[in-house]
Structures are given as C-alpha cells and as structure tokens.
Amino acid sequence: MSKKIVTLAGDGIGPEIMSAGLSVLKAVSKKIDFEYELEAKDFGGIAIDKHGHPLPEETLQAVKNADAILLAAIGHPKYNNAKVRPEQGLLALRKELGLYANVRPLKIYPALKKLSPIRNVENVDFLVIRELTGGIYFGQHELADDKARDVNDYSADEIRRILHFAFKSAQSRPRKLLTSVDKQNVLATSKLWRKMADEIADEYPDVRLEHQLVDSCAMLLITNPQQFDVIVTENLFGDILSDEASSLAGSLGVMPSSSHGFNGLALYEPIHGSAPDIAGKGIANPVSMILSIAMMLRESFGQEDGAAMIEKAVTQTFTDGILTKDLGGTATTKEMTEAILKNCQ
C-alpha cells in the first residue's frame, strides 16, 4: 500500500536539499520495493509571502492526512521584525500534530573526526530524546520591573508518555541503555520524573536505566560521550543538551532529527537553519536532509533495509573524501548527492 509523504521545502536552501533528499528516496525505494506518493505544500516564509500565514489551512489539512512529513528548512532575516514569522508556523504545526518527542541521533563518522571540537569521539553513537510539549516553556510566565517568574509544570501523563517512548527506543538498540536526565536534588518536577522512570523501568526488564543530573550529563557529553546510548529528558534540559551534543559532530550539516506525535505521525527535518546566505548557490550540504529521510524510512515505515542503505552510503561517501564546504571539502550539493546515490547498494 502506497504511503503518503507531505514535503515542506520551506525557505532558503530548503528546496535544494529537499530535491537532493527526494532523489535518494526515489532511488532507494526502487531497491526495497517501497511505494509512496508525494504532496508538496507551502510552509514557512514562502507561505507567508503567498498566503499571509506560515501554516496555511491547506498545508495543515495535508499534513494531518499524511503518513509522514518531511521539512527542509524555514526562516529568513527579512522576517526578524515582522508581525508574522516563519517560526510561528513550526510552533503551530507541533501543537496541531501533538509532536511530543524530539529525537536527535548523534553519530561521529570516522572520516569527520577531525571536525569535532573534542578529541575523544571514537565510537560515539547515541540519541537525545527531548520532551516537547510540557515544562517551563509552556508554563505560566510573569514579568514585572523588579521580578519575573516562569513556572515549570509537568503532568504525570506527559512524563509517562515520553518515558515509554524513550524505553522503546532504547529497547530497539543493541546496548539497550537509557539515561534519564533530571535535577531531582532540587526540582519537584525532576523528583516526579525520576520516580516515574524507576516505576516504568519494571515494564522494560531488558533495558538498563541510569540516572544523571543535568549538570553532570552536560560535562559527560564532553568528557565521555561514549557512555551514552539513549538520553531522555524534559523540554528545557533537552533543548540545551541536544544542542551541546550536536556540536560534537563538527557540522550541523550531518544532523537529522524526528519529532513524533500522539497518533504516530512524525515530522522529519535537518536541525540546521535555512542558510539564506548560500541559497541558490548549489553548495548546501544535503546530508542532514538525506539522513532525515533515512530516519523516516526506519521510524515511520519500518523500512530498516532502506534506512541502513542510506546511512551506509553516507558513511562511504565521507570515507571517499567527498565533502561539502562546511565539512572542509569542495563538493557541491549535486556532487554530494550523486556520490551518495552511487554508494546506495
């Protein structure tokens, strides 16, 4: 049965890397007999220009009826002081789809080790899972001249939902290790978080659960990143730790992500921005988009062979020394994509 994939190319380099990613999806799908149909919709800045809103109703209805969503990039400096901004569309999309679990995989490729800001990056391969719908970002906010207050609020249901997602993610990986990150020595929300993690762990006897305080975890991501397999944490901590972890890769151009909703629908996107300064020049790194498509094949459609094929092709392309400018090479978007296509075996 054919799967429906809605594509949101967005702004800046978005259309270029989306095109590159879809060419890889097309080639790999033929090899694994995966059938799909694409529906392209306006989103972000281009949607503001054409429809007056970053998330038009037509786009919203399309994504709600999709089996998966691919987003390339949104944003442009011209909207920085505008009343309506592209980023508002992404926040609205997350809310409408109930996207509660953000997943960022970090893998250090041997050929790219020299790009990492730290030396000790051998065999680094882990996930950071961040809760997206609760916590201090969504609590009550008060600001006065001499006082301010932000409320960190989590329900048991919100914590339970993300922890089950994380345990299942750890269960699917060879090491089966889950590190739950909190600040339970200070925060009430973290005390509840840790209590629930220990209780839920009984349902996953094959997964080893460890606890880390957030400050300790931040240090260990630099001093011993190999110890991690799957990290799960609340919204604010996850925002900070996932960005810290991403820096280990040396370039955002190789970092994919996924965000999963209540009903199983997921959004896949690179973690980098729209890079308007290089848009249209044909030099954007398409790898994060291509790897996001690999995540889609695995997480939404169970196509492990297709996902592994893409990931191995990317690894081989790096090993062959074909690198875009952000990785220290000279390859164009087209050349990088063609090399990955060639290595899809």
Curated annotation (Swiss-Prot):
BP-aspect Gene Ontology terms: L-leucine biosynthetic process
Cofactors: Mg(2+); Mn(2+)
Chief place where the protein resides: cytoplasm
Site features described as Important for catalysis, chain residue numbers: Y137, K183
Enzyme Commission number(s) from the entry: 1.1.1.85
Binding site for NAD(+): G273, S274, A275, P276, D277, I278, A279, G280, K281, G282, I283, A284, N285
Top-level taxon in the UniProt lineage: Bacteria
Keyword set, alphabetical order: Amino-acid biosynthesis, Branched-chain amino acid biosynthesis, Cytoplasm, Leucine biosynthesis, Magnesium, Manganese, Metal-binding, NAD, Oxidoreductase
PROSITE patterns: IDH_IMDH
UniProt cross-references to InterPro entries, sorted A to Z: IsoCit/isopropylmalate_DH_CS, IsoPropMal-DH-like_dom, Isopropylmalate_DH
Keyword Cytoplasm: yes
Cell location: Cytoplasm
Cofactor note: Binds 1 Mg(2+) or Mn(2+) ion per subunit.
SMART domains the record matches: Iso_dh (SM01329)
Residues bound to substrate: R94, R104, R130, D215
Intrachain disulfide bonds: none
Broad class of enzyme this protein falls into: oxidoreductase
Coiled-coil regions listed: none
Alphabetized GO MF terms: 3-isopropylmalate dehydrogenase activity; magnesium ion binding; NAD binding
Record text on subunit structure and interactions: Homodimer.
PANTHER family assigned: 3-ISOPROPYLMALATE DEHYDROGENASE (PTHR42979:SF1)
HAMAP family assigned to the protein according to its UniProt record, in alphabetical order: LeuB_type1
Family: Belongs to the isocitrate and isopropylmalate dehydrogenases family. LeuB type 1 subfamily.
Protein's UniProt name: 3-isopropylmalate dehydrogenase
Gene of this entry: leuB
